[in-house]
């Protein structure tokens, strides 16, 4: 069984992405790493992602293709379990993993699930054209979600903006806000097209989400590839103290309840959904 990992980055040093650490992780896990987007245009459209991701998937030679964001790793302790999981579900189009979202090295939230572990050997017609932004994988037009593919407790470790400065975040958020406006005709919850306005909207979202970051761990618990970088976060980087937010936020009982509900109860409820085993549905995919 051969595993390919597809990722993308553009000017990763300028954008302060943990790209060196991420690629080291990918090369340790996969037989092949395909890197896209090195010449991706500054002012992009969301529709630009579809052909890029499709090209990455189609050019991959692995039996399984894992689509990874460059700020996301898989823990080395899960490598063998992941490989065994791929063998177990070899007849399914994808596998869904949990997403551990980090803003600081010491707390995380189980934000969502992602169906980005894709079975190319048996489902070569997978395309990246689904979801709200048109970048999620589909099979025969069916959006791959956590409800229609097998689910694993293995996690994607997502570091989001941990290593970025306020200036880098502001410019990134403004670029994405402009792309959002070009696609949907409004800015939604992204604020506006200037760095200042986009950052303000983003930071309000961060404050809301950080309230649910109630699960704690030590730096040594992280994937080994990223530990040294986490130990050397500078004061002007978001992950140092969230630009002051870390010291000012006061969590309520509701915040803890919501965090535990999303991590445990929602998974418990989801465990009863076995629709992915429906052979008729699987044949349609």
Q: What residues fall within each predicted segment?
A:
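Hydrophobic targeting segments
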Residues: 2-7, 26, 32-35
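Generic beta-sheet signal
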Residues: 3, 65, 93-97
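The conserved acidic donor/metal-binding loop of glycosyltransferases
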Residues: 69-73
């Amino acid at each position: 069984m051969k595993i390919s990992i597809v990722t993308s980055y553009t000017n990763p040093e300028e954008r302060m992405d943990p790209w060196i650490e991420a690629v080291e992780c990918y090369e340790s896990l996969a037989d092949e790493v395909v890197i896209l987007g090195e010449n991706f245009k500054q002012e992009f459209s969301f529709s630009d992602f579809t052909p890029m991701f499709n090209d990455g998937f189609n050019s991959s030679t692995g039996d399984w293709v894992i689509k990874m964001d460059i700020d996301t790793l898989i823990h080395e302790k899960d490598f063998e379990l992941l490989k065994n999981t791929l063998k177990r579900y070899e007849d399914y189009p994808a596998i869904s993993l949990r997403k551990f979202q980090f803003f600081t090295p010491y707390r995380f939230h189980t934000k969502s699930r992602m169906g980005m572990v894709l079975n190319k050997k048996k489902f070569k017609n997978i395309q990246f054209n689904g979801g709200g932004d048109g970048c999620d994988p589909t099979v025969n037009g069916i959006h791959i979600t956590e409800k229609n593919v097998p689910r694993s407790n293995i996690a994607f470790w997502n570091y989001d903006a941990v290593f970025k400065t306020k200036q880098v975040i502001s410019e990134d958020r403004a670029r994405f806000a402009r792309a959002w406006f070009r696609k949907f005709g409004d800015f939604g919850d992204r604020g506006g097209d200037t760095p200042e306005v986009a950052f303000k909207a983003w930071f309000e979202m961060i404050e809301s989400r950080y309230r649910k970051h109630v699960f704690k761990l030590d730096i040594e618990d992280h994937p080994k590839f990223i530990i040294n970088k986490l130990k050397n976060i500078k004061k002007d980087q978001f992950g140092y103290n969230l630009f002051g937010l870390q010291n000012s936020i006061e969590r309520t009982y509701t915040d803890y309840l919501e965090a535990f509900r999303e991590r445990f109860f929602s998974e418990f409820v989801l465990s009863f959904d076995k629709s992915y085993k429906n052979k008729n549905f699987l044949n349609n995919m």
